[in-house]
Amino acid sequence: MNPNELIVKLQSKIDLKTKPPGSLGTLESLALQIGLIQNTDSPELKSPHILVFAGDHGLANSGVSAYPKEVTYQMVFNFLNGGAAINAFCKQNSIRLKVVDAGVDFSFSDDSTFLHPDFIDAKVGFGTKNILIESAMTKEECNQALEKGAFISTKKVSSNCNVIGFGEMGIGNTSSASLITASVLKKDLREVTGKGTGLNDQKFQKKITILEECLCKHQSSLRTPFEVLQTFGGFEIAMMIGAMIDSAKKGRIILVDGFIATSAFLIAHKMEPTILKNAVFCHKSVEPGHIHLLEEWNAKPLLDLGLRLGEGAGCAIAFPILLSAIAFLNDMASFESAKVDQKL
């Protein structure tokens, strides 16, 4: 159907439901967006998935996080054992969760984890390099991560899946997100850097100092979004970008989580601008950089719950709102079918 014709048809269907026009607020714009993504006036959500990409960061060794980098691989075990917040929310909402080793500094090949049905081995390397010294990734590694992300979207997600959320796990990755955001949006680092997983004031100041040094070292040589990603990103961020772009090409709804996932989306959007129409921004994080990212697209996130967890938790929590948008569009009576008089 012609997009302009579909907009008219969807908007008419929304407006003729037994309610005052616009009274369902964001649910109405969300129903319209989902219908346009799926090119139908009767959309549905099939086989929802959330992918959690895990990777370590060389910069974590410099003290930019409140937690040791071992927490990354420990949380991978926790995800696969069903014990994390994202597990609880996925179970609550019947969402399939898959965990991707994009670049964790740990070998899972000697463990039964390697055979877990929800574990995806896509390791590019055992963590990125320390960006205080050199770029996080080589050009080849960055391309490999992007390609593996696209492969996962194509081969490791159910073929009938039409809605997919993106989460991450990686000690130190809020630092990468801050550097990506500052570099691409031309913002001062202090405007886009928060305390991450809970740094005290002294350690937060140390984080700022380290990130300013990283930016000063590399910024003059960065000309493209790819170069920003290669220099400041992580394997999990790059792989997420590849999966986002591929999923959008497949006509899926893209659920964007918090600060790190949205910094990945920033690069994805620079690489493939059409991806924006598929994106649903699930929540507003307390990380200051996230607010600047959302402002880049004038995005209105579905939730504002003070989240700063990652893992794709915001995607899972917001998912029932998408279900509600679909439910009213498909199941609510129209004025005509219900024999209810419309506004005079």
Curated annotation (Swiss-Prot):
Pathway named in the protein's UniProt entry: Nucleoside biosynthesis; alpha-ribazole biosynthesis; alpha-ribazole from 5,6-dimethylbenzimidazole: step 1/2
BP-aspect Gene Ontology terms: cobalamin biosynthetic process
Reactions that this protein is recorded to catalyse: 5,6-dimethylbenzimidazole + nicotinate beta-D-ribonucleotide = alpha-ribazole 5'-phosphate + nicotinate + H(+)
Active site, per annotation: 311
InterPro entries: Nict_dMeBzImd_PRibTrfase (IPR003200), Nict_dMeBzImd_PRibTrfase_bact (IPR017846), Nict_dMeBzImd_PRibTrfase_N (IPR023195), Nict_dMeBzImd_PRibTrfase_sf (IPR036087)
GO MF annotations in UniProt: nicotinate-nucleotide-dimethylbenzimidazole phosphoribosyltransferase activity
Superkingdom assignment: Bacteria
The EC number(s) this enzyme carries: 2.4.2.21
Entry keywords, A to Z: Cobalamin biosynthesis, Glycosyltransferase, Transferase
Spans traversing the lipid bilayer: none
Family stated for the protein in its record: Belongs to the CobT family.
Role: Catalyzes the synthesis of alpha-ribazole-5'-phosphate from nicotinate mononucleotide (NAMN) and 5,6-dimethylbenzimidazole (DMB).
Name assigned to this protein: Nicotinate-nucleotide--dimethylbenzimidazole phosphoribosyltransferase
Gene that this polypeptide is encoded by: cobT
